[in-house]
Design a protein with these regions (language model features):
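Active-site hotspot residues in diverse enzymes, especially metal/ion-binding acidic/histidine motifs
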Residues: 1-206
Length: 206
């Protein structure tokens, strides 16, 4: 679990390039540097980022153009990181669409962990697109998609192992959570384990 094991993820937002290098040794280079490696980026048709095997080692090339927001660059890097961590064979065209969905989910969970978001929601925070953009440093489209995705998750049937993992993640990021959502007396009296009630509230997120 990268969220728990990474020394470079102690709060949000964080440096995605440092996490990638820490966990894989992969370096990230902008598209301008691609020529140095003999890589023709235009041949891959990706405007944002691409992971390539160069002489036995992987490199993630990304578009560092000024017209692309840093938040979008960060998500694109997380997306390519996801492809690597899940051992996706990107030459397998029949499963490519599935791989894209999985890589998007990987990046979203890394940059905006559902466990942290759910804890913030329990503390009375209104989880809006703007809220995620502000505190997690993500793009408008990534924040919007994250809310839409989490609304579809049914948390009423979490296993004991999943709940334990949730608690570990919330515990690690307690300082960040307390900073943006201090515990109030009303929260202390709230039944945080009433998952059915929480699920009903999530259904009304916007």
């Amino acid at each position: 679990m990268i969220l728990l094991s990474s020394n470079n993820i102690q709060s949000f937002p964080f440096s995605i390039t440092k996490v990638i290098k820490e966990k894989t040794g992969i370096v990230c280079r902008n598209y301008e540097k691609a020529e140095t490696y003999g890589v023709d980026i235009s041949a891959f048709g990706s405007e944002d980022a691409i992971i390539q095997n160069f002489r036995g080692r992987f490199i993630i090339f990304f578009n560092d153009a000024p017209y692309i927001m840093n938040e979008r660059k960060k998500f694109s890097l997380g997306h390519e990181f996801g492809h690597y961590m899940m051992n996706h064979d990107l030459n397998n065209k029949s499963d490519y669409s599935l791989y894209e969905v999985e890589a998007n989910f990987f990046a979203a969970q890394l940059l905006m962990p559902e466990q942290v978001i759910n804890e913030l929601r329990r503390r009375g925070m209104q989880i809006t697109q703007e809220y995620l953009q502000r505190w997690f440093g993500v793009s408008k489209s990534a924040a919007k998609k994250r809310i839409e995705t989490l609304r579809k998750v049914d948390y009423t049937h979490r296993t004991d192992e999943e709940k334990e993992m949730d608690n570990y993640i919330v515990s690690k990021f307690q300082d960040f959570i307390n900073k943006i959502a201090p515990i109030s007396n009303s929260f202390l009296a709230y039944d945080t384990y009433d998952e059915e009630k929480m699920q009903n509230e999530r259904d009304h997120w916007y």
